[in-house]
Each structure stands twice: as C-alpha cells, then as structure tokens.
C-alpha cells in the first residue's frame, strides 16, 4: 500500500484528505493516463487556497472530507481517470462511498472533474462540496 496525503483547501477551509492509496485495488493504469501519473501538482491561481496532488493514476484511495475541528462528513474511495479522447480528468466516488452525516450513498457520483492541458502541463478541476463550488488549477511541481 502506498501512503499518500492530498489536501484541498479553499477560503471556506474545507479540507479533503486522501489518506491512503492501494495500487493493488484492481484499478489499472491506462497508457493514456501516463502524462500525469505519479507527478505532483500544486495550485497556481489563488494565494488563498492550496492544493497538492501526489499519487498515481487509477489508484483507489481512502478519503475523508471535513472542515477543521469537525468530524469527517464522508469516508469513501475515489477513482481518478482520464478519457483518452479529450483529456477529461474525473475524480469520482467509487463503490461503497457514503455520506457519514446522512448515510446516503455517494457511489459513482463525480467529486471533481476537469481537464489536462498537455501544452501547459496543468490540470484544472472543479466541483461542489458542502454546498460550495470550487475550482482548482494544478501545475506539475518539478
């Protein structure tokens, strides 16, 4: 099991931590995903928010989403994949995902989605969490 820490922070101080990833989870790396596999991306747009991704494509990871000082509101797995045709990037809740507060299933729902720009080597992601919309532009850290 590969240990990974990923945090997304924004002005509302929502923090999403992907606390562990398992390369033997049954997800396989598609050759079309390799341009961003295993690289680290950091947000470059806003000084008020911070994002860092350091993991391999198509790993399944444990996720806890929470606000500072609060219990996690979701505990699930996510899948990160990239469409070979249009460089679409999607992070979605995998089978078994659920909202800890309501108990409602989140399986298959999109958490963040966006695209990979091969020219600028950036990933742009957007999505909704806890009633707020977030947009992240991530650039590979050399």
Model-derived features: where do they sit?
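Bacterial Sec-dependent N-terminal signal peptides
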Residues: 14-40, 140-142
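Tryptophan-anchored aromatic micro-motifs
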Residues: 29-51, 78-82
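Sec-dependent N-terminal signal peptides
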Residues: 4-13
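Short, low-complexity, Pro/Ser/Thr/Gly-rich segments in the mature regions of secreted, periplasmic
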Residues: 131-142
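Positively charged n-region of N-terminal signal peptides that target proteins for export
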Residues: 1-4, 22
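A short glycine-rich beta-turn/N-cap micro-motif
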Residues: 38-40, 57-62
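Contiguous, well-ordered beta-strand patches that form the walls/edges
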Residues: 46-48, 62-126
């Amino acid at each position: 099991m590969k240990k990974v820490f990923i945090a997304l922070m924004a002005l509302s101080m929502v923090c999403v931590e992907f606390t562990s990833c398992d390369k033997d989870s049954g997800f396989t790396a598609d050759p079309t995903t390799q341009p961003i596999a295993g690289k680290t991306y950091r947000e470059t747009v806003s000084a008020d928010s911070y994002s860092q991704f350091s993991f391999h494509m198509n790993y399944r990871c444990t996720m806890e989403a929470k606000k500072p000082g609060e219990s996690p509101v979701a505990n699930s797995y996510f899948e990160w994949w990239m469409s070979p045709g249009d460089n679409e990037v999607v992070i979605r809740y995998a089978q078994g995902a659920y909202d800890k507060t309501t108990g409602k299933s989140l399986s298959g729902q999109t958490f963040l989605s966006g695209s990979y720009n091969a020219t600028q080597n950036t990933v742009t992601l957007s999505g909704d969490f806890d009633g707020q919309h977030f947009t992240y532009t991530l650039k590979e850290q050399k």
